Amino acid sequence: MKLKAKYKQQSKVGKVVQVVSAVVDVSFAGKDLPHILNALECTINNEKIVLEVVQHIGDDIVRCLAMNSTDGLFRGAEVIDTGEQIKVPVGKSILGRILNVVGQPIDDLGPIKCDNFSQIHKDAPKFINQSTSRKILITGIKVIDLLTPYISGGKIGLFGGAGVGKTVLIMEIINNVAKAYKGYTVFTGVGERTREGGDLYKEMVGSNIIDLNKLENSKVTLVFGQMNEPPGARARVALTGLTIAESFRDMNEGEVLLFIDNIFRFTQAGAEISTLLGRIPSAVGYQPTLATDIGSLQERITSTKFGAITSIQAIYVPADDLTDPAPVACFAHLDATTVLSRKIAELGIYPAVDPLNSSSQILDANVIGQEHYSVATKVQEILQTYKSLQDVIAILGVDELSDDEKRIVSRARKIQRFLTQPFHVAEVFTGKQGRFVSLEDTIYGFKGLIEGKYDDLPEMAFYMVGSIDEAIEKSKTL
């Protein structure tokens, strides 16, 4: 395959000497070697393959990571050094579009006309440029707004094992927050199902977040590196999405929402790459650079004087083990953690948020107000007492409890059920209309519960309702 003469004149040309899955060795014999992280390009059957330099291994050979499939690549194929890192288009011209890891459109809407490009590898903003303001981001989801309030301009993690509702919860937050949001939104799909990305795109078109008739009026950009793609794409696509979010932030046009689903797949891709590069694995088979990989991504997700990035990230927990090194590496970087529990999901309580394991840095009376703080801590206290009594109940039964303990158990069970909520994105499955509950209604409802105002209502009146008024109406039909 002959490359265009103009590329040969301005770029170094090498030759492929080895291809092992997504790792490609390229020889630049007698020439200066490309820098680490430089992008190399090779054209096979009119398809461009993008490589990223990750190692210099001696004998004028660089080891590279492929961003797309290496099918058809052969020894001796010519490769050009672009002389720069992978760059992706940024700015308003990519609104309403779906991009891959190298910024190419994958939505069949034609090429992107863009003059502004930005490299995907960057340093975090300097300390003096970072913003530390703290205010609550209202999601309309009772259990989150009450017990683990999200920080506007902060980093939020949704932790959970397989099938407990991470993606549904992140989709509901997109529905409640992004649709009513004036700023821009970036959704980054990292190693997840292609079908989910397609469903999200259609939903955004249907709700006019993406305006196909006038793309510049759209409010979102989608970036996908799905589970069928090489580990290079899955390891770098989170950086591509973050680069686009940073560009919107630095345009000084308000806050930016950055959704990432799923951070664990980013870690998993890093482990695959580490093995292919011959590194010795660390605990549980993860790459030895796990903390560095996570840190280099998370430290860039920050708010500055120009604008704020609010990041909401789904994080898969292998085998429901929160002590696994991958989720542990994420905990330290987050401002709020929402833990989804399989035991709670088994009780039919959705969203299956564990109110005692989840936390937020702004669950503080000085930030959220004394009333909100008092109600939240009292709810946690009642739920903790109920949890400690469950062994007694299992062995001796409820009748052996004191009257005060029986009252706490009754209120705790009602609180548990009132923490449930029908979701807009799950209407087709539940047959129930979704509910958005304001923070004021949430605090008012739980305050009444802990004060005993609704002790006479049956438990099921509180299940899958929005506000407390809806629970009162439901009790009349039971």
Swiss-Prot record:
It comes from the Bacteria. Its EC number is 7.1.2.2. GO terms for molecular function: ATP binding; ATP hydrolysis activity; proton-transporting ATP synthase activity, rotational mechanism. Gene3D superfamilies: 2.40.10.170, Bovine Mitochondrial F1-atpase, Atp Synthase Beta Chain, Chain D, domain 3, P-loop containing nucleotide triphosphate hydrolases. It is found in: Cell inner membrane. Keywords: ATP synthesis, ATP-binding, Cell inner membrane, Cell membrane, CF(1), Hydrogen ion transport, Ion transport, Membrane, Nucleotide-binding, Translocase, Transport. The keyword S-adenosyl-L-methionine does not apply. Belongs to the ATPase alpha/beta chains family. This is ATP synthase subunit beta.
